[in-house]
Amino acid sequence: QVQGQLHTAQTFGLDYVNTMSDPAREAADCGAVVEYFDEQPVAIVEDRALLADKTHLARLKIPDPLGGGRMHNSIKALALFQEQIGREKIIEGWVEGPIAEAADLRGINTLMTDFYDDPAFVRDLFSFIVEMELRFAREQVNAGADVIGIGDAAASLVGPDLYEEFVWPLEKQLVDGIHAL
């Protein structure tokens, strides 16, 4: 990944490299089932969602970003970028936003009904995710990331009322936490 990013940046005169390869990194380190393909990014196997049984959230542990999993691979890539290009280009790390990661852990369709059927669970899940993503972001900054991107496209699937009540406060907490690093 590092050599591909560096080659692309050099070939096209880009001032930026990043480690965002797919949205399944954190979920995989939590224990989610992911599928690998030859011609597309890694994907979550939604019909085997890690939190299909939402009671499992109480036992779910935040993975160590330096624990040898896919998150650690991203951190090692950032360290290689820092070693090879230093301040020559912007180095971007990446985390998932609360609703995107919740969809990866719970399944997008199930999560959408959870907003109505069990809003307390959604809040607990989002809080778990923000804590995990802040730990991951911290280690990425420590490894050399200049900026941290956040992917939360699934937020576009909820209306303004749900967004304001559930998503916005946790996205703001995540952004504020990253700014504080």
Predicted regions and their residues:
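A contiguous, low-structure linker/loop signature
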Residues: 23-64, 87-88
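Active-site loop segments of alpha/beta catalytic cores
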Residues: 15, 40-46, 63-181
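Short, glycine/charge-rich beta-strand/loop segments that flank catalytic centers
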Residues: 19-29, 93-100
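Catalytic domains of carbohydrate-active enzymes, especially glycoside hydrolases
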Residues: 3-21, 139-144
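An N-terminal domain-start capping segment
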Residues: 1-5, 53-63, 98-99, 105
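Short intrinsically disordered, low-complexity coil segments enriched in acidic
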Residues: 1-9, 89, 180-181
